[in-house]
From Swiss-Prot:
Molecular-function annotations in GO: FAD binding; monooxygenase activity
Result of knocking out the encoding gene: Impairs the production of oosporein and leads to the accumulation of orsellinic acid.
Lineage, opening ranks: Eukaryota, Fungi, Dikarya, Ascomycota, Pezizomycotina
Species in which this protein is naturally found: Beauveria bassiana (strain ARSEF 2860)
Record-given protein name: FAD-dependent monooxygenase OpS4
Keywords per UniProt: FAD, Flavoprotein, Glycoprotein, Monooxygenase, Oxidoreductase, Signal, Virulence
Pathway: Secondary metabolite biosynthesis
Upregulation: Expression is positively regulated by the oosporein cluster specific regulator OpS3 that binds the promoter at a 5'-CGGA-3' motif. Expression is negatively regulated by the global transcription factor Msn2 that binds the stress-response element 5'-AGGGG-3'.
Residues carrying sugar: 54
Similarity comment: Belongs to the paxM FAD-dependent monooxygenase family.
Length: 427
């Protein structure tokens, strides 16, 4: 009679999208998972995000996608305009149908809180031990354990995942000599949510929100993006422009008149949206140099999401790539049952994921360059190429519709990639 195989135990530090993805994926493979979130509860924080087919196919696999449909903005069009609204540079009609038919998965716009709530519910339903108010005080790399603040509880695992975000304390503990403090990029973001019910006095603006589309305005050192969430009942609007926050300040309440002055002369329709903003915060955009490694030398600690590869938002891949991380890690762990093989799994995980996310981060910087061009010969050449579609031999100025980059981004199947790695490395 064969012996019963005991499941491995994954301890996840951080209840964001990377941590939740890893927890769900690992439970679906039959292993145990404990997820530690230091906040006392999962509050409605954040704003909009864009779920591209590389992540929605994962959410479908995990049994989450259908729970989100009523909360999604499903855009039928993606448009890029000159900042002043004088010219449409690119327009892709039937965006929802194109994404579904080309990638067999949808492109949805979503409020982060709705996505997180659905993933927390799914994780709990699957049996993940989700703990809130659980702050990690220290880690024991020799014993593969974490010690919780306050109670001093020692939580033993077989493998530990640091998914505690850009300002990860776990990263600093694992790699104290790397000098991994995030650095300012020189840009900031105004993040705005406008409710449809508050725009009824302007039928044109209300119609924009009620009929979900994705819209970019591109200008000198700045651009704006707007899309509907929550079934077309809210508009998520983000303004990206040069950073003027004081040193040491990462987030602050913004002055409305200052914000409007920054975008004076832009598309009158965009400015009308800004006239309806009652309060707004501005967030400093941070980045971090590529890390030489994600795995601790012990072989039993690794990282995912912003804790190891924060990326700028110009391709909207931060959340999507974090979910890819979790999917790959969970699938790879599903291929083993002995804790002694975890170092091999983590080595494959790092090899698979690191090269992809580093390329995405570089492509996001390219997108920033192309969307923030000042008026002049380069901008005129960009506009001409975009409007005449004479970009076939190289990457498009807008990677959102680029026939080279879009399939590489959206066609990625994290589960298939992990399965291929298992077959090729004989994990």
């Amino acid at each position: 009679m064969g012996s019963i195989r005991e499941p491995l135990h994954l301890v996840v530090i951080g209840g964001g999208l990377a941590g939740l993805s890893a927890a769900i994926a690992t439970r679906l493979e039959g292993h145990r998972c404990t997820l530690l979130e230091k906040a006392p509860e999962f509050n409605e924080v954040g704003a909009g995000l864009q779920l591209t087919p590389n992540s929605t196919r994962l959410l479908r696999r995990w049994g989450v996608l259908d729970k989100l449909r009523s909360k999604a903005g499903i855009p039928t069009q993606l448009t890029v305009r000159r900042y002043d609204g004088s010219k449409v540079l690119s327009r892709a009609d039937g965006w929802d149908e194109t994404m579904q038919s080309q990638y067999d998965a949808p492109f949805w716009d979503m409020h982060r809180a709705d996505l997180q709530a659905a993933m927390v519910a799914r994780a709990r339903h699957l049996g993940v031990d989700v703990r809130t108010g659980a702050e990690v005080e220290s880690i024991d790399t020799d014993g593969v354990a974490v010690i919780l603040a306050g109670t001093r509880e020692r939580l033993q695992g077989d493998v530990v995942l640091a998914a505690d975000g850009l300002w990860s304390r776990t990263r600093a503990a694992l790699f104290p000599d790397l000098g991994t403090a995030p650095q300012p990029t020189g840009d900031l973001a105004y993040r705005i949510i406008l409710r449809l019910e508050n725009l009824q006095h302007d039928p044109e603006l209300a119609a924009w929100v009620a009929k979900p589309t994705v819209n970019f305005w591109v200008g000198a050192d700045a651009h704006a993006v707007a899309y509907s969430v929550r079934g077309g009942s809210e508009l998520n609007l983000v303004l990206l422009c040069p950073d003027d926050l004081p040193e040491g300040c990462a987030r602050a309440q913004a002055d409305l008149e200052e914000m409007r002055a920054r975008f004076q002369g832009w598309d009158p329709l965009l400015c009308r949206f800004l006239d309806n903003v009652k309060t707004v915060e501005k967030w400093r955009l941070m980045h971090m140099p590529s890390l030489p490694k994600w795995n601790h030398e012990s072989g039993y600690f690794t990282m995912a999401g912003d804790s190891c590869h924060p990326m700028l938002p110009y391709l909207a891949q931060g959340a999507n790539s974090a979910m890819e991380d979790g999917a790959v890690l969970g699938r790879l762990l599903g291929s083993i049952h002995e804790a002694s093989r975890i170092p091999d799994v983590l080595a494959v995980y790092q090899e698979i994921r690191k090269v992809r996310v580093e390329k995405i981060a570089k492509q996001a910087l390219k997108q920033r360059y192309n969307f923030h061009m000042p008026d002049g010969p380069l901008q005129e050449a960009r506009d001409e190429a975009m409007t005449t579609h004479q970009q076939r031999e190289e990457e498009y100025a807008s990677q959102w519709t680029c026939p080279i980059m879009q399939p590489w981004l959206y066609g990625y199947d994290a589960i298939a990639v992990a399965d291929s790695a298992v077959a090729n490395t004989k994990l």
